[in-house]
């Protein structure tokens, strides 16, 4: 069995979870088995490209990234994918390249958008009695 240097990271947004496998390769990036260029809708595709464009495509020349994403809606999945890719890149550079390049990547990601590396901790508020939702109340009649 050959030991290819690889790391596994995850990204989350609401109920969407993306797991990225980053390993040495020839620059392939796939999401659920299909190329990254086929991510739909097209407007959200550029959100997935953000971590790639931030650090430059030269860093991806010898790295393969496979992402599996489940749960949530389209937008949540896209945000989970981009977070998994960004975290995977940082982890790969920390483990197999050097600390300086890892710090450069981290700095670039956090200065652009903090959610590329840190998950959004907001969760839905639980429903309470006396109304239809967490804050909404049933209508009150005085007569």
Curated annotation (Swiss-Prot):
Residues 134-143 have a biased composition (Basic residues). Gene3D superfamilies: 3.30.230.10. One of its GO terms (molecular function) is structural constituent of ribosome. SUPFAM superfamilies: Ribosomal protein S5 domain 2-like. It holds the Pfam family Ribosomal_S9. GO terms for biological process: maturation of SSU-rRNA from tricistronic rRNA transcript (SSU-rRNA, 5.8S rRNA, LSU-rRNA); translation. This is Small ribosomal subunit protein uS9. The gene is RPS16.
């Amino acid at each position: 069995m050959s030991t290819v240097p690889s790391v596994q990271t995850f990204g989350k947004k609401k109920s969407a979870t993306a797991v990225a496998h980053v390993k040495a390769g020839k620059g392939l990036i796939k999401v659920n088995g299909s190329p990254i260029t086929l991510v739909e809708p097209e407007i959200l595709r550029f959100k997935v490209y953000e971590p790639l464009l931030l650090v430059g495509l030269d860093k991806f020349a010898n790295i393969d990234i496979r992402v599996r994403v489940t749960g949530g809606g389209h937008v949540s999945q896209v945000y989970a994918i981009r977070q998994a890719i960004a975290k995977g890149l940082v982890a790969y550079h920390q483990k197999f390249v050097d600390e300086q390049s890892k710090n450069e990547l981290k700095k670039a990601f956090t200065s652009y958008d903090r959610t590329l590396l840190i998950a959004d901790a907001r969760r839905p508020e639980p429903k309470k009695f006396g109304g239809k939702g967490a804050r909404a109340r049933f209508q009150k009649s005085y007569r």
